[in-house]
Amino acid sequence: MPRRREVPKRNILPDPKFHDKTVAKLINVLMLAGKKSIAESILYGALDIVAQKTNDEAVKVLKKSLDNIKPALEVKSRRVGGSTYQVPIEVRPDRRVSLAMRWLIKYSTLRSEKTMKDKLAGEILDAYNSRGAAVKKREDVHKMAEANRAFAHYRW
C-alpha cells in the first residue's frame, strides 16, 4: 500500500482531428522521444489507410480492433511458501486498454510492411478481423490464465 497520497489520474484531451480520447491516448503510446507530431502523422496516416480499405469510419474500426485485443485475464507471480505460482487475475479496465494499445504497437513494429503507417494499418485491420499477432498475444495470455486456474485461490 502506498504511504503517500494517491496520485490523481491525469485527464487526457481529445485529439484535434477526430476529437476522440482513445485516439489521443494511442498517439501518446505511439510517441517516441517526445515527437508527438510524428506519432500523429503515423496514426492519422494509418487510420486513413484503414478507412480506405474498410469503407467504414476509421475510429470505429480502431475501437473494435482494440476490443478484440483487450485481455480479460492475466497471470501474476505470487510467492507462497518458497515456490512461485502464476495466479490468474482479472485485468482492470484501464489496464486492459493500455495493454491492448501497447500490444497493437509492439506487434505492428514487427510486421514486414515498409512504413510504420502501413504496419499499423495492417495490424489494426488484422485485429479488426480477429487475427494477427496482437490477437494471438491476447489468446496466449488467456490460455496461460486458464492453465493456471488451479492457483486462483491464491488471489489477493
Curated annotation (Swiss-Prot):
Gene Ontology cellular-component annotations: small ribosomal subunit
Q: Which InterPro entries match?
A: Ribosomal_uS7 (IPR000235), Ribosomal_uS7_bac/org-type (IPR005717), Ribosomal_uS7_CS (IPR020606), Ribosomal_uS7_dom (IPR023798), Ribosomal_uS7_dom_sf (IPR036823)
For this UniProt record, the keywords arranged alphabetically read as follows: Ribonucleoprotein, Ribosomal protein, RNA-binding, rRNA-binding, tRNA-binding
**A single GO BP annotation from the record?**
translation
The reply on keyword tRNA-binding is: yes
**Disulfide feature:** none
CDD domains recorded:
uS7_Bacteria
Q: What are the protein's GO molecular function terms? A: rRNA binding; structural constituent of ribosome; tRNA binding
* Gene3D superfamilies reported in the protein's UniProt record: Ribosomal protein S7 domain
**NCBIfam families annotated for this entry?**
rpsG_bact
Task: Fill in the subunit field for this protein.
Answer: Part of the 30S ribosomal subunit. Contacts proteins S9 and S11.
Q: Provide the function of this protein.
A: One of the primary rRNA binding proteins, it binds directly to 16S rRNA where it nucleates assembly of the head domain of the 30S subunit. Is located at the subunit interface close to the decoding center, probably blocks exit of the E-site tRNA.
The record's similarity note reads:
Belongs to the universal ribosomal protein uS7 family.
The family database entries (HAMAP family) matched by this protein are listed as:
Ribosomal_uS7_B
Q: What is this protein called?
A: Small ribosomal subunit protein uS7
**Species of provenance:** Pelobacter propionicus (strain DSM 2379 / NBRC 103807 / OttBd1)
Q: What is the lineage of its organism?
A: Bacteria, Pseudomonadati, Thermodesulfobacteriota, Desulfuromonadia, Desulfuromonadales
* UniProt gene name: rpsG
